Amino acid sequence: MSGAERRPAAGRVQLDSKPTPTTTADGNQNITEVDAFDKRQTFDPAVQYKMNHQRRGVALIFNHEHFFWHLRLPDRRGTLADRNNLKRSLTDLGFEVRIFDDLKAEDVLKKVFEASRDDYSNADCFVCVFLSHGENDHVYAYDAQIKIETITNMFRGDKCQSLVGKPKIFIIQACRGDKHDDPVLVQDSVDSKDETTVNQTEVDAAGVYTLPAGADFIMCYSVAQGYFSHRETVNGSWYIQDLCEALGKHGSSLEFTELLTVVNRKVSHRKVDICRDINAIGKKQIPCFASMLTKKLYFHPKSK
């Protein structure tokens, strides 16, 4: 058979014809096999999302501080600091920020649906933030729970075609469990001011679980599943504080998942210093994110 006849046809899957056995010291055979591969499928690991559209995109912030009495949920003191910090950080990155405070569940879903019907053809991406209490696979609006999947489903490719292939970022600041993370490292405590401005630490009730959302989604959670998310009554939540600081310092230069890893590290170095629940003193927190992104994501400054 000639050399030309032995060559595989272009585009065909190529396999090693036979695994190669080797014999180990104890007499057993160690066989190495090669997985099939398609020569056409070559991926550039450095490929980035196209972020040079006319607009950066829309960022929705649903901020919930107060809740209907029958839910028996405490007010989320300090959440206004989170809302304002996020507005500043996202605006600096070029987003059109829309803020909604203490909306009922029906109104939240209406605003989300309206956003999903917008035309994002000339936008880079989309951001949606929830600052609230959470439970299982839900977050709380003013008067009722909302299933997170109900929200993310509105931005899938068959529902929001102008965001197909573009990053869809969801940030959830809510508790995800009923446990505190025990500290393993000692950290210097934060000095408190006079009693009227003491910055106490509180937790966001109940738990939120990670959900699949589809390609080009990234779900950013303030805490790993099963643990409390901490919020300071003056400065806001640990996660949003450190996220906004990282966005301010590195938002236009660092790849987004790398930036989130920096935030994980910063939050993990914190611990509870002042809290009405004495069992929470000294406890820690670790955020997490679930990335379904398919390319690297940068928020490089837009040319003017």
From Swiss-Prot:
130's region: annotated segments: 137-154
Active-site positions on this chain: H133, C175
Localization annotation: Cytoplasm; Nucleus
Region of interest (Tri-arginine exosite), ranges: 54-56
Amino acid composition bias (Polar residues), ranges on this chain: 17-29
Keywords: Apoptosis, Autocatalytic cleavage, Cytoplasm, Hydrolase, Nucleus, Protease, Thiol protease, Zymogen
One annotated GO biological process: apoptotic process
Entry EC number(s): 3.4.22.59
Superkingdom to which the source organism belongs: Eukaryota
InterPro entries tied to this protein: Caspase-like_dom_sf, Caspase_cys_AS, Pept_C14, Pept_C14_caspase, Pept_C14_p10, Pept_C14_p20, Pept_C14A
A cellular-component GO term for this protein: cytoplasm
Domain comment quoted from the record: The N-terminal disordered prodomain is required to prevent self-activation. The Tri-arginine exosite is required to recruit substrates for hydrolysis.
Function comment: Cysteine protease that plays essential roles in programmed cell death, development and innate immunity. Acts as a non-canonical executioner caspase during apoptosis: localizes in the nucleus and cleaves the nuclear structural protein lamin-A/LMNA thereby inducing nuclear shrinkage and fragmentation. Lamin-A/LMNA cleavage is required for chromatin condensation and nuclear disassembly during apoptotic execution.
Listed name of the protein: Caspase-6
Organism, scientific name: Gallus gallus (Chicken)
